[in-house]
């Protein structure tokens, strides 16, 4: 079931086309954001595209050709008008030379070298470029920074493995290895300062209003758990939680709720499931002295009883120690945890007794909410005597194996539920009537509505249901929306979907706004969107040519608008500002690079192979 749920979850993040061939080409496309542009896009965007195997850089309507055909990994600092890239290094097959061009006095300069023999990855922030360069003396990478304005290169640290940049931030973060210990440092141009030791996961979020870093390090207080931190651009790392056991990164949308789980008392204590009635009495059991049990006839029978009691106590102590060690090493625990959400208002508790693997949806924004399978822990049904008996007949390893099975069996489903934090208080309501193995659950972006997409018995189409949540988070009742759905995507308070017959490559695009479904387009092969009034639609898909093509439309101001015909479906990009760059192919096979910014489509260049950067 988990595999199916994971597969269903992935459908939220990628658009499923009606035809299998369309799926492949659409999944690589960047989601469209709101169309913005007061000046002609062809004169404001920075773009890089391929022509005759060489890269062409376009800045503010000016162009230059990079003669080195190995040029790739282009990055842009739009404020300075610079485009950075790398080329294969002549010094080594595995290293690169770092270069850039820039717009000066209305013209693009010739390529300039920043440094030779750098490693694969680099980053750009606040006009500076950060990269790694192998230091032969120490046999590890140096972390280097260059400011093209003063043409100065400096080393900010040795033995660096990874660098993380944040948009608009003067500081960067990097990982430096101390033996096997991954240490995260913060560097703001002065001396690097240590941010955290024993770091595990690190994620950088850019291209948003508040760029930030989220990272975890091994907990100093709880084995198997981590400390969870956030570091916003321009700020210092702040602790979110000191005993996280799981974090829902895949569901996280920057600026919204970050869901994570901590151990409850039941989840860290095996004794909640295995009854240990000897725990207190064993503290007073000591090894008997023979001299205390002498009688006229020798050692009394009471001595043998006391010795057996002591030996049993030693076995129980060994079992307790082995169980505690297994729990401390994270080898097993009761899968019933407490769910929290980190929000702009701070940390909010969402629910108790949650198995992180059985959370089926989480509201990205608004008051924290989750749809999950409520778990019930059955405690104390196995006695310590049972474990002692196994240890006497076998060994401690078999005891641990048996205990793990008991712990797993102790957690049973208490039914589907919706849990939320409403006004600072946790609430939970039943959510029944769904077959979890065939249903994908999702919240609307604002968390005010539940959507359920139920796959048909053949597994080919979906039926859409919705359920509004009242002010207490309680579902108001399921409402059927539509059937025969082949692809979908959620917006702030609704869902856009493609409805098509099985075996048919086209269908109609609808938007459900909470009250009714409104038809937006017909004869569509696929669609992409970020907001309900900015939808990109592909029609007349053709896969017979060497390059699959389709006609490109946008849905704006309540109507369809054609952007270009015969557009290569795997060769168009969208900038963060919503400008669309595409390649159209005419009947002769000629390929033209076009730009659309919400006004008219403009042809920028011809004989274009692919678009590699659009900013």
What are these regions (language model features)?
Residues 45-51, 83-86, 130-133, 172-176, ...:
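Residue position within the beta-strands of beta-propeller blades
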Residues 5-24:
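N-terminal Sec-pathway targeting helices
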Residues 570-585, 589-593:
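C-terminal structured domain segments
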Residues 69-80, 116-127, 158-169, 198-207, ...:
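Repeated scaffold domains used in trafficking and secretory/extracellular systems
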Residues 164-166, 172-185, 189, 193-239, ...:
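Solenoidal tandem-repeat scaffolds enriched in leucines and small polar residues
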Residues 51-68, 92-113, 138-157, 181-196, ...:
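Surface-exposed loop/turn elements that mediate protein-protein interactions on large endomembrane-trafficking
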Residues 30-67, 71-76:
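An edge-strand/N-cap motif at the start of beta-rich repeat modules
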């Amino acid at each position: 079931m988990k595999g199916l749920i994971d597969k269903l979850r992935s459908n939220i993040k990628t658009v499923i086309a009606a035809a299998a061939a369309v799926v492949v080409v659409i999944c690589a496309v960047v989601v469209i954001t709101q169309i913005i542009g007061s000046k002609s896009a062809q004169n404001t965007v920075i773009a890089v595209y391929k022509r005759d195997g060489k890269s062409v850089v376009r800045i503010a309507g000016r162009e230059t050709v990079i003669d080195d055909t190995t040029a790739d990994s282009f990055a842009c600092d739009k404020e300075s008008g610079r485009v950075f890239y790398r080329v294969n290094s002549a010094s080594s097959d595995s290293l690169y030379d770092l270069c850039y061009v820039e717009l000066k006095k209305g013209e693009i300069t010739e390529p300039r070298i920043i440094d030779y023999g750098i490693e694969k990855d680099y980053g750009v922030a606040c006009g500076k470029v950060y990269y790694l360069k192998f230091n032969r003396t120490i046999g590890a990478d140096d972390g280097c920074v260059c400011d093209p304005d003063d043409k100065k290169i400096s080393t900010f640290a040795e033995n660096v493995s990874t660098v993380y940049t944040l948009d608009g931030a003067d500081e960067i973060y990097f990982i430096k290895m101390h033996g096997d210990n991954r240490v995260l440092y913060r560097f703001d141009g002065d001396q690097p300062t240590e941010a955290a030791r024993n770091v595990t996961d690190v994620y950088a979020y850019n291209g948003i209003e508040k760029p930030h870093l989220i990272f975890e390090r091994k907990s100093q207080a709880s084995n198997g758990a981590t400390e969870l931190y956030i570091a916003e651009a321009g700020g210092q790392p702040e602790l979110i939680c000191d005993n996280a056991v799981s974090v829902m990164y895949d569901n996280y949308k920057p600026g919204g709720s970050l869901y994570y789980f901590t151990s409850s008392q039941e989840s860290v204590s095996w004794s909640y499931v295995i009854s240990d009635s000897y725990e207190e009495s064993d503290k007073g059991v000591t090894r008997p002295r023979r001299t205390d049990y002498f009688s006229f006839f020798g050692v009394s029978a009471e001595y043998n009883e006391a010795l057996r009691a002591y030996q049993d106590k030693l076995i129980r102590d060994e079992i307790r120690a082995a169980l505690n060690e297994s729990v401390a090493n994270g080898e097993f625990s009761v899968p019933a945890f407490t769910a929290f959400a980190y929000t702009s208002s701070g940390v909010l508790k969402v629910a108790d007794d949650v198995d992180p693997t059985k959370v089926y949806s989480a509201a990205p924004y608004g008051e924290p909410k989750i749809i999950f399978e409520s778990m019930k822990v059955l405690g104390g049904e196995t006695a310590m005597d049972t474990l002692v008996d196994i240890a006497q007949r076998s060994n401690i390893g078999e005891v641990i194996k048996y205990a793990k099975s008991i712990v797993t069996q102790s957690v049973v489903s208490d039914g589907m539920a919706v849990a939320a934090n409403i006004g600072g208080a946790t609430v939970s309501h039943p959510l029944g009537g769904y077959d979890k193995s065939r249903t994908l659950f999702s919240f609307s972006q604002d968390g005010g509505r539940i959507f359920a997409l139920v796959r048909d018995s053949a597994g080919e189409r979906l039926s859409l249901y919705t359920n509004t949540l009242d002010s207490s988070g309680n579902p108001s009742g399921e409402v059927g929306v539509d059937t025969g759905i082949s692809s979908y995507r959620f917006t702030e308070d609704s869902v856009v979907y493609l409805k098509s017959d099985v075996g048919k490559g086209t269908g109609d695009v609808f938007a459900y706004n909470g009250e009714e479904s409104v038809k937006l387009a017909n004869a569509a092969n696929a669609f992409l969107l970020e907001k309900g009034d900015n939808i990109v639609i592909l029609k007349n898909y053709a896969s017979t040519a060497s390059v699959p093509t389709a006609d490109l439309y946008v849905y704006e101001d309540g109507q369809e608008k054609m952007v270009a015909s015969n557009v290569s479906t795997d060769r168009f990009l969208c900038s963060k500002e919503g400008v669309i760059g595409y390649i159209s192919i005419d009947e002769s096979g000629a390929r033209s690079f076009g730009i659309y910014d919400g006004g008219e489509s403009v042809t920028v260049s011809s004989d274009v192979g692919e678009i590699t950067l659009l900013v």
